[in-house]
């Protein structure tokens, strides 16, 4: 929708905001029922005069959207963190679990796949197919969330992943296996992006740190994959020296059991999302589409679910338009189909242009995307190929059982990372410094890891490295993408920014897969990963905007 507003300087905007808020408070005191609610607490909304954010975002958002979004933020603060948001925190976590089911699942089943299927030049080519799918999925689901809303991705991606994980378990050749993983990648590429945006747009600003804690579900998913690999792959796989000539399907069912279990769990999560947990479209997306009434309904739905008074009315949002010189007309409400058609006609790169509206925002966008690309290469070079590296590192006195036991221990230790990160990103160091410090420390430990000489030393060092790298992963990969990135971009363009970042991450994963295809499971990928993590830390120090202390708009 092409709506023009008068150009207003910062001082005039502050005066307008103050006048609007005072009128809103008076209206609410006079008209809203006051049963069991102290008069001074009814609809108390304070002006948010965040000059730093206003300067940072510039013309990337309209004054009307910014004021309405700040009003919604204050309403969410009044509602507080309640039953609805904690349920959403759990249901959104399902997406993180399934994301790990896919990313770690393909890594876990590649060794037995190579033993059973004939004609495989490099088993990691299946990872190449998977990452191609993820690149497509991240772009599609991220950008579409700005065009048609957050809910379609929220409800669809888990179903796609679950169905095709089960289907992949039934394949009997490498080409079909890789093709199905490409489809799985289209779902895995976008689900976590939208899950993070949805949680961010429903929680009060005081609880935005939960976006970092949300990634603890990802580590839980890694632990599930590790346990399934230990149970199924260690006990229902061909011997480690088997070849396609000696490894039959009947003797190698472990990887199939693993994928069927992962797919079944994903479908169960899908059922809960669609049929058990009821969620409206996010109010920030609705505001960006000019659908003020639906945004009011969404905010008040959260209030009712939390047992709180409804804090928002349509007249409050309309007052902002009137004070800015825009009078809403009575045009008929566009359907979802019409909104999609109009958005596609008007898109023409406008969402991307808005991400470079100011000098600082341009620098921020470029660095965020660069960091994501580098992490996309660094992380899978070590962690996605860890089971195969462990299996080949100490072949003389190791076994599949020992390999996956170690993998489970490392995964369990990694769960600590997100919880610690959620606390530390809220300290005086903020997001940027914690990202930079933890990334550099991770790189140092990865450099040292390749020097261990015994299996027990390898396990101990892997646990420490796993803790730090998962910790850095929350403060770099996950805190940047799934906490810092959505926090730092405005909702009208949040999906485009996050989706593009995720696409670059997945492109980095594709590069990592190609590197592994050429180098094999040697120490070379670990050295490369270590150097890249150090580089990420340096770039994090150059980010121009800190989201700690600022409520997302």
Curated annotation (Swiss-Prot):
Pfam families: MFS_1. Keywords: Cell membrane, Glycoprotein, Membrane, Transmembrane, Transmembrane helix, Transport. CDD domains: MFS_SV2_like (cd17316). Induction: Expression is induced by nicotinate and 6-OH nicotinate, subject to nitrogen metabolite repression mediated by the GATA factor areA, and strictly regulated by the cluster-specific transcription regulator hnxR. Belongs to the major facilitator superfamily. InterPro entries: MFS, MFS_dom, MFS_trans_sf. The lineage of its organism: Eukaryota, Fungi, Dikarya, Ascomycota, Pezizomycotina. The gene is hxnZ. Signal peptide: none annotated. One of its GO terms (molecular function) is transmembrane transporter activity. It comes from Emericella nidulans (strain FGSC A4 / ATCC 38163 / CBS 112.46 / NRRL 194 / M139) (Aspergillus nidulans). Its main location: membrane. Major facilitator-type transporter, part of the hnx cluster involved in the purine degradation. The nicotinate hydroxylase hnxS accepts nicotinate as a substrate and catalyzes the first step of nicotinate catabolism. The major facilitator-type transporters hxnP and hxnZ are probably involved in the uptake of nicotinate-derived metabolites, and the oxidoreductases hxnT and hxnY in the further metabolism of 6-OH nicotinic acid. Glycans are attached at residue 235. It is a multi-pass membrane protein. The chain crosses the membrane at residues 89-109, 128-148, 152-172, 174-194, 213-233, 257-277, 366-386, 409-429, 433-453, 459-481, 496-516, 525-545. It is found in: Cell membrane. GO terms for cellular component: membrane; plasma membrane. This is Major facilitator-type transporter hxnZ.
